[in-house]
Amino acid sequence: MRILFAAAECAPMIKVGGMGDVVGSLPPALAKLGHDVRLIMPGYSKLWTKLTISDEPIWRAQTMGTEFAVYETKHPGNGMTIYLVGHPVFDPERIYGGEDEDWRFTFFASAAAEFAWNVWKPNVLHCHDWHTGMIPVWMHQDPEISTVFTIHNLKYQGPWRWKLDRITWCPWYMQGDHTMAAALLYADRVNAVSPTYAEEIRTAEYGEKLDGLLNFVSGKLRGILNGIDLEAWNPQTDGALPATFSADDLSGKAVCKRVLQERMGLEVRDDAFVLGMVSRLVDQKGVDLLLQVADRLLAYTDTQIVVLGTGDRGLESGLWQLASRHAGRCAVFLTYDDDLSRLIYAGSDAFLMPSRFEPCGISQLYAMRYGSVPVVRKVGGLVDTVPPHSPADASGTGFCFDRFEPVDFYTALVRAWEAYRHRDSWQELQKRGMQQDYSWDRSAIDYDVMYRDVCGLKEPTPDAAMVEQFSQGQAADPSRPEDDAINAAPEAVTAPSGPSRNPLNRLFGRRAD
């Protein structure tokens, strides 16, 4: 099956949030199932210094009255084919924000749709978040391309209808107040990035005023848990760490802790309880909750706190002042550094995610993989990935709290600090987290079922043989009988520059360009 991802990010080249991790890691797992997965994304100027890109574009066209070119490259890690939409509007260093953000991503979505119609025609066009939300609308009456829309964060919903009408053409049948709402209505299938988040967004508390619409389309909505790349995130082989370690031998983690303390200017103490946080510094992530409890925690315990991230200026200022008040006990780096983030995962004893809401969260998976015990709020994907620790029966992998209140968070932190005093049981807790399997392989089977469903194909049974095949890293047989109709379809070829073959244009007697 031919699957085209359309997204604004792809790790490791361009990553701002969890969407970049998903887009960079899910395709290889889908390829193991026999799918041909490719990506189209904006051609950000910084990519030209990170990737080997075709000298000449493979296609030129225009849309929204503007010319663009498409270049081809390969993912540096997994070899996935990537198509870059080249235009000066993507030259600035910023990825998000700016006065032209709405036009920028609507233009990208339109270019991606034109590419799918004219150059490489997929069976499924998989769109990610509001940046690609108009694609399901334009594809709605094309019977040859099915659309899947993934909600990574419902809070960000894109431009409103009145603005869309000014910057592009909206089909007469289009409904929905903004890009996100339109995508939810017109995508053939919709998924959220965790089962719990898929349920939460149908309530008024987490629905961001779209709960009514999400209940209306609930028949095509499902939750599929995110995963992580276990090869890229492996404490036994991670070259960014001063010492490697595993669940069977944690001695290297102690070395990482000392190096982290030295590098961050903290007191070098093996017995200190080090809390790590790698996050966008925004209200969603509960940074304000940390600021409310940190002074008391540092005053009454031997805790140390390390924070890495950028975001809201007010929260950055609050963290900077906290570090100034507790020199040697609290360190804040207001930037993003991949190597330093890995050192924090490896060198911290516990990891903080006191989120207001959390669609899935990937940081807690990295933390557990590196032996850092998560302290999380019971919300969204954190519910699905961090079962609460129970000393009575030695179960669970982290410390959880319910309400978004300082006293609840503080209580969870004290519980974690007290548990750290009992080193033998703490190491068992670390090992349980490190042994969890949150690879993309199992999630890929769920996506495979969804793709087959939307294309009207028979769903394969994820039996023991398939799971075993995945665990050995083998690719599935792409010539399964039920796939014959789709696999027999001719490969698309590079199309010449020229008029769009958008079927809606033929239907309405107009051109998208």
Swiss-Prot record:
Molecular function GO labels? alpha-1,4-glucan glucosyltransferase (ADP-glucose donor) activity; alpha-1,4-glucan glucosyltransferase (UDP-glucose donor) activity
Is Transferase there in the keyword field?
yes
Q: Where does ADP-alpha-D-glucose bind?
A: 15
InterPro entries the record matches: Glyco_trans_1, GS/SS, Starch_synth_cat_dom
N-terminal signal peptide: none
Q: Which reaction does it catalyse?
A: [(1->4)-alpha-D-glucosyl](n) + ADP-alpha-D-glucose = [(1->4)-alpha-D-glucosyl](n+1) + ADP + H(+)
The record, for Pfam families, names: Glyco_transf_5, Glycos_transf_1
State which Enzyme Commission number(s) the record gives.
Answer: 2.4.1.21
Superkingdom in the source lineage: Bacteria
What are the GO BP annotations of this UniProt entry? Answer: glycogen biosynthetic process
Keyword set for this entry? Glycogen biosynthesis, Glycosyltransferase, Transferase
Name the SUPFAM superfamilies on file. Answer: UDP-Glycosyltransferase/glycogen phosphorylase
> Which PANTHER family does the protein's record reference?
ALPHA AMYLASE DOMAIN-CONTAINING PROTEIN, GRANULE-BOUND STARCH SYNTHASE 1, CHLOROPLASTIC/AMYLOPLASTIC
Q: Which family does it belong to?
A: Belongs to the glycosyltransferase 1 family. Bacterial/plant glycogen synthase subfamily.
- Give the protein name, as stated in the record: Glycogen synthase
Organism for this UniProt entry: Parasynechococcus marenigrum (strain WH8102)
What is the taxonomic lineage of the source species? Answer: Bacteria, Bacillati, Cyanobacteriota, Cyanophyceae, Synechococcales
Could you tell me the gene encoding this protein? Answer: glgA
